[in-house]
């Protein structure tokens, strides 16, 4: 409920202003108020987010290229991030691609393509989830993923959960405000918020169903952090019939998801 209200309020204010986060506060504030400061904070938050988001997008692009050319024998997340030249190269490619895309009409071009790409990614994730359920370690992986262990909950876990919630809601960086500016005034904001929350949660649960059975099947460390997605998915595709092409499609869709 709190997530729904947080998203809904951001969309309401932004749709009313029809402007970027910085100008949104300036347009809605009354004389003598200084809400514009929060627009600057949102801008700083976006810059901080992009500082690592562009790097992660470069990692995704790297895996897409590796699967596309069929050179997946030397995959290894640790080796990849240890190569600064490789990381900087893919980072620059991502930045250039982002600037080029932003120079076009987003609603007329990128938005239309993204709708199809994200639908295809969702279908592919459903296929991969079903495939993961056939792994030898599926039962153990699902038990680890879905059966709660309340004894493991401590302050660190709570803080990590809150960090994830704030990240998903784009709290503090004007994310909801940006999305709200593109919502037509004929759309019901509460309904849109509910749909986004449900879809976001569904995709997150689906990702867990894909990843954790594979971890227990291939002996991967479930607490590996950012490398979990890349190492796990590479292992899944390497053991699938036609895995090279499944992997190519998956990381292609992920590239579009990250860029959008």
Predicted regions and their residues:
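Single conserved hydrophobic/aromatic residue that forms the stacking wall/gate
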Residues: 2-13
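Membrane-embedded alpha-helical segments of transport systems
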Residues: 7, 44-54, 198-207
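Residues within membrane-spanning alpha-helices of integral membrane proteins
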Residues: 8, 40-46, 91, 95, ...
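Membrane-water interface of transmembrane alpha-helices
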Residues: 14-19
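Inter-helical loop and helix-membrane interface segments of multi-pass membrane transporters/permeases
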Residues: 21-44, 54-107, 136-160, 226-230
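Alpha-helical transmembrane segments
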Residues: 48-51, 55-62, 100, 124-127, ...
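Membrane-embedded translocation segments of transport machinery
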Residues: 111, 115-259
